[in-house]
Amino acid sequence: MNGKKEMKEINTGETYTSLVTGNFIDNSKSEIMTMSLTTTDTPANGKLVTIDSDNSVSSMSVDMDADVGKFVSCSLGMLSTKEVGVFVDGITSSNDYNTQVLFYNQKTKRLENPIYKKANRGRLSTQRSTTTTCEDIDNDGIMEIPVVKKLPVLENLRNSNVSYETSWCNYDNNGNSAKIKSTVIINDNYGYSINIPNEWINNYTAY
């Protein structure tokens, strides 16, 4: 009207805990990705919502970890130079953190959550006792996922605060696996972080 664009509200009928917009399907427009925690009525899920040119609404969904009671961050980021996803860091019922990655798989034409799908007896490979969250550690545009393990404890230092080894990983959709980009020691108690050379892996500890 008079050369001005009008904004129109479209009711998608979706309820959600968190929402991110992005170009997930490799087209010329953005879609909506919603993430929902478990409620008495619905299980935890992620949904990719699209709105067509005629304002019709369609969606596809994928299961998420029902043990997560709070989302810490839901970040739009690149899995690779061509794939966009949402990196979801959450807190579980045991106060651990974990990460799930939601993305539209161009080959299968489905919304996927591969880390949750490969969970071992309900435990995700990204579950950790530290509060580290996903980030692009080297500013190359591709997000890294923290995979954390506690370092071994020497017998005479059982009561000491042992550090955690954090492997920053990229998710490889082609191989359906995580690839380690770098490994660091993070000790929140003493406030330090150290890069670890490959030859040290499995041969050291730190406090």
Describe these PLM feature segments.
Residues 1-207:
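Beta-propeller-forming repeat regions
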